[in-house]
Regions:
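Blade-terminus and WD-like Trp-Asp/Gly-His loop motifs, strongest in beta-propeller folds
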Residues: 1-9, 39-46, 50-51, 119-129, ...
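Asp-box/WD-like beta-propeller blade repeats and closely related beta-sheet repeat scaffolds
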Residues: 2, 8-83, 95-112
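Residue-level signature of beta-propeller blades and closely related beta-rich strand-turn architectures
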Residues: 15, 53, 135, 181-182
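Hydrophobic beta-strand positions in blades of beta-propellers and related beta-sheet-rich domains
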Residues: 21-23, 82-86, 144-148, 184
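Short loop/turn segments that connect beta-strands within beta-propeller blades
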Residues: 25-29, 88-92, 150-154
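Beta-rich catalytic cores
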Residues: 35-37, 80, 116-118, 142, ...
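Loop-centered beta-sheet repeat module
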Residues: 109-151, 155-160
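Long, well-ordered mid-to-C-terminal structural blocks that present hydrophobic/aromatic surfaces
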Residues: 148-184
């Protein structure tokens, strides 16, 4: 549940086994349904989203279990067509950072594991976001890479790796994070 403009809220809702979200106008009580779930919204109304079905399949702590797409037979470990999506004010959805590209950035191509991206979070101005690339290693430990994506120039930078957990933007260019290994 998040604010979407000053008089509207937006929340995720499973609709007949499919991802969706509802924009609810508090004043008029009108609803608009989007055919995707949301994660983060910037001040311009752009939305970040991800594949909640994949998230549930790989990490039962998050995601939604009652989605039809969970049993998709086309599952890939490092897909080019899945990752973080951006949805603009006209509700056009496009992939902005693929799992494949994140794996390449982090130099993890030779690791034979299923990867996922999660927690995409805009900075205050909405021109950057961070996300976590994650996988479970052979001993079952959750390995994470915190990546910052600059929407103005498309640059992706690894900020921290290995054990990364909670984070929060404190300014448009600074983030506080719990981790074991910061990138130099």
């Amino acid at each position: 549940l998040q604010w979407y403009d000053k008089d509207k809220i937006i929340y995720n809702k499973i609709n007949n086994g499919n991802e969706s979200s509802i924009i609810y106008d508090i004043a008029s009580k009108n609803k608009i349904r989007l055919n995707t779930c949301i994660y983060s919204i910037n001040k311009n109304g752009n939305i970040l989203s991800l594949n909640y079905s994949r998230l549930w399949k790989l990490w039962k702590s998050y995601g939604y279990k009652d989605l039809k797409s969970i049993n998709d037979n086309k599952f890939e470990s490092k897909p080019k067509n899945d990752g973080i999506y951006i949805i603009n004010r006209d509700f056009n959805k496009n992939i902005i950072f693929s799992i494949h590209d994140a794996v390449n950035l982090c130099g993890l191509n030779n690791i034979k594991k299923d990867f996922f991206l999660c927690h995409p979070t805009f900075n205050f101005d909405g021109d950057k976001f961070v996300s976590l690339l994650r996988y479970f290693n052979d001993s079952g430990a959750l390995i994470s890479y915190l990546i910052c994506t600059n929407l103005n120039n498309g640059e992706n930078v690894i900020l921290a790796r290995e054990k990364v957990s909670h984070f929060e933007w404190i300014t448009n260019n600074e983030i506080i994070v719990w981790c074991r290994n910061l990138n130099p």
